[in-house]
């Protein structure tokens, strides 16, 4: 580490890159998306921030790079990639939404929305764990105890396990809702 007497193997950079680019990005994206899905069913389409990559790309493609909107177009480019990474992790959710929209349009019945929220509510604290609070606490503690490499291990193991658990439970919830209300 620069300006300290600590020296690490070059492998710390590999571990850090893996934890940051592969694990952290997916964890935050899915935690954010699950909260937006929950808010969609709780508050409705107009009050939730449940965007689709296709709609973002459509808006982005309607703009020109050489215009006053170039910065917004650049923002939409990265936001579309982020939203695409979210959508790629929730295939059952998108199948469920497609079937619900085919059957009910934009008016998903209250009992379906309430059932979905009731079953997804226990997952919301876990989305907080994979988003910010827990990871910041572990980062500061690992630095404070002089073992900063522990944060990368924690990110790559514990938080990945939480992400897999939350994703599995949420995808099974979507499959149950799909079977119960769209067949």
Question: Where are the model-predicted features located?
Answer:
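Multi-pass membrane catalytic core of lipid/isoprenoid biosynthesis enzymes
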Residues: 1-28, 139
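C-terminal membrane-associated helical module and adjoining short loops/tails
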Residues: 23-24, 33-183
């Amino acid at each position: 580490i620069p300006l300290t007497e600590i020296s690490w193997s070059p492998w710390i950079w590999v571990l850090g890159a893996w934890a940051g680019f592969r694990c952290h990005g997916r964890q935050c994206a899915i935690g954010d998306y699950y909260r937006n899905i929950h808010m969609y069913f709780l508050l409705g389409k107009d009050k939730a921030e449940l965007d689709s990559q296709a709609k973002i790309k459509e808006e982005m493609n309607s703009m020109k790079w050489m215009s006053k909107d170039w910065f917004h177009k650049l923002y939409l480019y990265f936001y579309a990639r982020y939203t695409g990474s979210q959508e790629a992790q929730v295939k059952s959710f998108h199948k469920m939404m497609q079937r619900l929209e085919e059957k009910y349009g934009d008016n998903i019945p209250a009992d379906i929305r309430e059932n979905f929220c009731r079953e997804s509510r226990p997952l919301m604290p876990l989305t907080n764990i994979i988003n910010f609070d827990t990871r910041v606490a572990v980062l500061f503690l690992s630095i404070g105890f002089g073992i900063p490499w522990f944060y990368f291990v924690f990110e790559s193991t514990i938080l990945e396990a939480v992400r897999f658990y939350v994703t599995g439970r949420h995808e099974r919830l979507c499959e149950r809702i799909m079977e119960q209300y769209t067949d």
